[in-house]
Amino acid sequence: MDFSDDDMIDNKSGEENYSYGGGNESDDYNDVVDTIIPSEKSYVILKEEDILKLQRDDIERVSSILSLSQVEVIVLLLHYNWCVSKVEDEWFTDEERIRKAVGLLKEPVVDFNGGEKDKKCRKVNIQCGICFESYTREEIARVSCGHPYCKTCWAGYITTKIEDGPGCLRVKCPEPSCSAAVGKDMIEDVTETKVNEKYSRYILRSYVEDGKKIKWCPSPGCGYAVEFGGSESSSYDVSCLCSYRFCWNCSEDAHSPVDCDTVSKWIFKNQDESENKNWMLANSKPCPECKRPIEKNDGCNHMTCSAPCGHEFCWICLKAYRRHSGACNRFVVEQAESKRALLQSEIKRYTHYYVRWAENQSSRLKAMRDLEKLQSVQLKELSDNQCTSETQLQFTVDAWLQIIECRRVLKWTYAYGYYLQDLPKRKFFEYLQGEAESGLERLHHCAENELKQFFIKSEDPSDTFNAFRMKLTGLTTVTKTYFENLVKALENGLVDVTHNEFPPDNETKSTQEKYEEYQDYEDDFLETQRLYDEALLSGCYYD
């Protein structure tokens, strides 16, 4: 099987990406990551030529074992998503069934070769099944089924399929009732070079996207892929040569030590439109007359809906104010208000975690830009002003790399904290998180603000700058230690925490009771919303 060296690779989109200048900066970043999340590298970064070699090796292996042509093997591997072992097992179990399933027929359905020995038959023209013109046998092309079509019609048919997208990889004979596969040899024979190259690109992409062992780097414009060889218990975070870090398992931004399920729930919650409905339920009530939502900021409970409605009602019980007794002590009202307060509390809790999650991501992206500026412009200025070589200034780069990775870890700990239900574990987690965050803020402030003074040329820079070097290096080391402790604890599921470590004083009991009350409510959250909506629409709170 031949592949064009000019094959291009389409990639999935990802988050904003920075290359941190040139040289070996991505290696520096990976070294910093390894200090926070120490693990053996269980993946390999693949270039396009590496992928092509792996693909050819698989094709040649199956071709040798099954004694099939490489064209036939490609059809088989495409059908089984490039799983070599499954192809071999299925083929030796029931070859006839597999041939029928993938369209590799042993005998043609239509045979125009019966008169091969008869010289007269060689001169008989054959009618094309698409344009119905007559052609000589040399102008007709067939796949394993034998249905005859002229090469011009074949070219038009296949080109259309390829232009339609990757579905062309499983293209069948043009005869509607025929399931015979169209192989790469036919495509190369009848299509133009440009079309054939596009088909080859689809085959290459299929090897990565349909297989289970390789994935593209999701960073925009990156042509690398990653082959993962770790176990299910190991971290799925990988660092591409383009400097982008992502989770190989779920293709999201790298999120260790937080698991993929938590990340998936968190991202879904952030995108879920029901959060808008929750806010409306918690912070507004429908006018009993026109049903438009009304938000009450402050003041008394006597509400007047805006024009053209003008309906006057009580904010507490929603009863028309002209029939209002001045007391709102019905149990159903108290129950509704209790649920509303619970929703408000949950919204505040979610907002607390979301804001900090988003702010750390924003700070991380800003730190990436600051590092890029430092490496591309400021290191040269700093070297000139402080009369020292750029290699002696690597500690500033290390500090920024540490900041970037710590911001990433801290960002995802807020998603972890949102779903952490065990109160003793939550206390210990928040302690570790707080220590790590405080250390990171000191490091970030030092790198961002205290470094600025040294871009101004000084007559005697050495003493002050050396003191700064020691401070920044020390903060980098301390912050790394804080985050190592945090990551290790989260990876172990905070197993070292026991309930005895946090005796249930009165305040803890109260918090526990409130938390359990919320959990009981959350288990039946959708049903509560439905009943609450029905109650509002039916007007049971103000009749």
Curated annotation (Swiss-Prot):
Q: Which reaction does it catalyse?
A: [E2 ubiquitin-conjugating enzyme]-S-ubiquitinyl-L-cysteine + [acceptor protein]-L-lysine = [E2 ubiquitin-conjugating enzyme]-L-cysteine + [acceptor protein]-N(6)-ubiquitinyl-L-lysine
Specify the pathway: Protein modification; protein ubiquitination
Residues holding Zn(2+) 2: C145, H147, C173, C178
Gene Ontology biological process terms from the UniProt entry: protein ubiquitination
Indicate the residues that form the catalytic site: C300
Q: Which cofactor does it need?
A: Zn(2+)
ZnF RING-type residues are 128-178, 287-317
Give the boundaries of each IBR-type zinc finger.
197-260
What keyword terms does UniProt attach to this protein? Metal-binding, Repeat, Transferase, Ubl conjugation pathway, Zinc, Zinc-finger
Q: State how the cofactor is bound.
A: Binds 4 Zn(2+) ions per subunit.
The residues that the entry says bind Zn(2+) 3 are: C217, C222, C240, C242
Q: Which residues bind Zn(2+) 6?
A: C314, C317, H324, C328
Q: Recorded E.C. number(s)? A: 2.3.2.31
Q: Where does Zn(2+) 5 bind?
A: C287, C290, C305, C309
- Any idea which positions bind Zn(2+) 1? C128, C131, C150, C153
Region (TRIAD supradomain), start-end ranges: 124-332
Chain intervals for the UniProt region annotation (Disordered): 1-26
Tell me one Pfam family matched here.
Answer: IBR_1
- List the molecular function annotations (GO) for this entry: ubiquitin-protein transferase activity; zinc ion binding
Binding residues for Zn(2+) 4: C247, C250, H255, C260
Recorded family membership: Belongs to the RBR family. Ariadne subfamily.
Q: What is known of its domains?
A: Members of the RBR family are atypical E3 ligases. They interact with the E2 conjugating enzyme UBE2L3 and function like HECT-type E3 enzymes: they bind E2s via the first RING-type zinc finger, but require an obligate trans-thiolation step during the ubiquitin transfer, requiring a conserved active site Cys residue in the second RING-type zinc finger. The active site probably forms a thioester intermediate with ubiquitin taken from the active-site cysteine of the E2 before ultimately transferring it to a Lys residue on the substrate.
Job description of the protein = Might act as an E3 ubiquitin-protein ligase, or as part of E3 complex, which accepts ubiquitin from specific E2 ubiquitin-conjugating enzymes and then transfers it to substrates.
- Name under which the protein is recorded: Probable E3 ubiquitin-protein ligase ARI9
In its UniProt entry, the species of origin is given as: Arabidopsis thaliana (Mouse-ear cress)
Question: Quick one: which gene encodes this?
Answer: ARI9
